[in-house]
Amino acid sequence: GKAPNFLTTILSNPLGDSFTFSPLVLHGNVPLLPSTNNATGWGVGAKAVGRTTPSDTGWSNQITYTTPSFGGLKANLHYQFGEQTGANDSKKNIGLNAIYMAGPLTLTGFYERDQIMNPAAPNVPLTNTRKDWMLGGAYDFTVAKAFLSYGQSDEDNTNAKAKTAQVGASVPLGGGKVLASYAQTKLQPVNQSRKTLTVGYDYNLSKRTDAYVMVMNDRITSYESGNSVGLGIRHRF
C-alpha cells in the first residue's frame, strides 16, 4: 500500500509521481549512488541520509485507517510491521498524513517514524531511527497553479539532517500545460547540497493520451552537474 509520504508528495508538485523528472520525488525518494558512497550522504542503504523519505513511497504488510472527510479534510493513519527477528524485532514504521481540499486550495502534510527501509526482501532495518515530515500545498489561480513544499528528515543518535524545499508551477497553454519545478536539499553536518530544476510541456492528445517533453538540470556538491532530456507519449488504460 501507499506510504504516508506518497499523496503529500504528488499533490505538492506539478510533476506528480514522476520518478524521472519530478525534483521533489527525486530528492525525497530516489537514492543517487551505490552504498559505497554513503559517506557523502547521497547513497543507498541503511546509512544514506540524502533522501527526505528513505522508507520509499510504498509500505508492504501495513494497516491503514482512513478517517471520514470533514469539510474537505481527511487523514490516513499507517502502521507497518517490521517483520524483524532478534535485536530488531521491535522495529516498525508508523506514520500519518492529512489532506485538505477546498475549491482551488490544497493543503497536505505527512509525518513518518522510519525504522525499516522499503522496498526490500526482507525489509532492511535502518541504522538509526529516522523521523521525516513534509508540509505542502497548491493553489489554482486559473491562469496558473502554484505549488510549494518543505520537508525535513532527522536521524536519532546523530546530527544527520536532510532539508528539502520545492516550488513549482503549472500553466495552461494551448492544449496542454507548461510544467516547472525547482527543489533544493541541504544535508547536515556534511554541508552537501543538491539543486534540481525541471521544465517541460505536457500536451493532451485525448482524454487518456498525452505527449510530453522534459528538460532537467541536476547539481550536487562536489560532482559535475547533469542534464537530462526526455520525450514520450503516455496512454492511461
Can you describe what each PLM-predicted range is?
Residues 1-3, 76-80, 108-112, 147-151, ...:
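Transmembrane beta-strands of outer-membrane beta-barrel proteins
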Residues 1-82, 90-92, 99-106:
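Outer membrane beta-barrel
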Residues 71-72, 174, 206-208, 223:
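Short loop/turn motifs that connect adjacent beta-strands in outer-membrane beta-barrel proteins
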Residues 89-198:
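Detector for outer-membrane/organellar transmembrane beta-barrel domains
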Residues 117, 153, 215-221:
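A short, acidic, flexible beta-alpha connecting loop/helix-capping segment that sits on the rim
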